[in-house]
Amino acid sequence: MANSQSVRTVVVPAAGMGTRFLPATKTVPKELLPVVDTPGIEMIAEEAAAAGAARLAIVTSPSKDEVLRHFDEFPDLVEILRARGKDEQAAKVERAAEIIHPVAVTQEKPLGLGHAVGLAEPVLDDDEDYFAVMLPDDVIEPTAAMSEMIRVRQEQGGSVLLAVEVDPAHVSSYGVFDIEATGDARVKKVVGMVEKPAVEDAPSNLVATGRYLLDRAIFDALRRIKPGKGGELQLTDAIDLLISEAVSYTHLRAHATDSY
């Protein structure tokens, strides 16, 4: 259950085509591919609920209704499983509908992460000053990272972005942080962000991973930035715009991250 000190809404961009996982994703959305026996989107829902969120705004394409349907109740299936003595499996089927309240947000065209996040603005309540973004591709350790990000926001204010260190040779695949030290070894002040820089131009080897705790002002910034390659709106460009206007950003370093 959400409380006054927790994030209320978590936005999950899930409209991508999943091309890295073809041919499996021809018919099964990437977000429903299992990590062991649990779909990635359900793991995200669990993480969001653990951070106190009450609402999961899932941004999907018109052809990916199955992602939202995963959170439906399946009483007929549960009844069959229980009749066969498969109570453990029945409980797993029931679990998804009990985790969090899902809300569908439709992205008609894949126009970038920033565009997907911007579409979720109407889902937020009028009094929500901040919200979270979780990317379902990234499995984060520790799983309580969002709760720690909320703590950092309460103590220092501003938005909080999760970062990991990568091999400097690979920075051109990520949004890269330009940072300054703070009194906390795990928390740095973000003074800039660069989307997929050349190796020689990268300000650090600390890169954005799939967890963001953002002030509501990001929506206005997304309306003001210009589309980049392919007409896409990049979330990092909107963040960098707000940083240039002296909006406070910090980042918290994760222990590890993986993509599935």
What are these regions (language model features)?
Residues 250-257:
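Conserved small/polar residues in nucleotide/adenosyl-binding loops
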Residues 241-249:
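Catalytic donor-sugar/metal-binding loop of nucleotide-sugar-dependent glycosyltransferases
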Residues 2-82, 147:
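N-terminal glycine-rich phosphate-binding loop and ensuing alpha1 helix
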Residues 183-203:
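A short, charged helix-loop
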Residues 227-237:
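Short, charged, surface-exposed loops that flank catalytic or proteolytic processing sites
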Residues 69, 77-79, 87-180, 214-216, ...:
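Conserved beta-loop-beta/alpha segment of the NTase-like Rossmann-fold superfamily
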Residues 206-213:
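A conserved mid-domain beta-alpha-beta active-site/ligand-binding segment of alpha/beta enzyme cores
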